[in-house]
Amino acid sequence: SEMCIRDRGVALTKALEFGSLLTVKIENMKEQHKKAAELNNANRAAYEAAQASKEEKETLKPVSPEEELGFVSVAAGDGLRALFEELGCAQVVSGGQTMNPSTEDIVEAVLATPAKTVFVLPNNKNIILAAEQAVPLVTDRKIIVVPTRTIPQGLSALLSFDPDASADENASAMLSAAENVSTGTVTFAARDSEFGGFKIKEGDTMGMTNGKLEFVGDTPVRSVYKVAKALMNKHTSFITLIYGEGITEEEANEALRLIKNKAGDGVDINLVNGGQPVYYFILSVE
């Protein structure tokens, strides 16, 4: 997974609501993806290989805490990392694809964040503990863990940040923003199992709503459509559909079309090429 650090250089004000801000960011990303696609594929592969080996050699240098507030955020996948960067990430630390960052990784990232108070957004329930264990290990700045359990929660928390509010006010605003998001995921079974009343075969597609298994055995596109349908209600105004490394652009657009037809015109839907491992789709519904 990758960790991204956001300093306060890009203050997000309350006036920018999740929907409109994310729309702008996603338009920028689409533009970037278009430019990247225009590069010759061979060039791009060579460039990425060089970048990857460069990243492995770099270690984070500690910096003195001069800003008031900063962020460390955890995410996996180039597109998701780009999205967190677009939201103001100054630096990105890479771990392995399915490897959760250690407490040590988080401490290193915190020390490389030039802020007196550093918010940590784990964005995964399995990383919350590692983040909390980092708190007593850093003495020259304060760490506040906002226990985000999913990528959509992390994005929403980040977007509710108010540079004029105190650290404690922000911590509670960010947590409540995170809790107002529904998260859907579509993944695949790593092995045969029985779970939540389902008999699951290795490789089966699994659709989950807020962590609860709901659908087994559809195609990823069909599954994410069912998940979206289950999470939408009459108050839904914004949906972000983030597709992973196993999904083609055609499949992503087909999923978008199905969800758009179901949601109708009143719902703002955005598609993001997240490139994340493990999850075919991550869905944010607000």
Task: Show which residues each predicted segment covers.
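Long, charged amphipathic helices and adjacent flexible linkers at domain junctions
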Residues: 23-72, 187-199
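Charge-rich, low-aromatic oligomerization/scaffolding segments with amphipathic character
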Residues: 7-23, 129-132
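C-terminal edge-of-domain segments
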Residues: 26-29, 270-286
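Conserved structured catalytic cores and adjacent interaction surfaces
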Residues: 32, 76-176, 278
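C-terminal tails and terminal domains of large nucleic-acid-associated
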Residues: 238-244
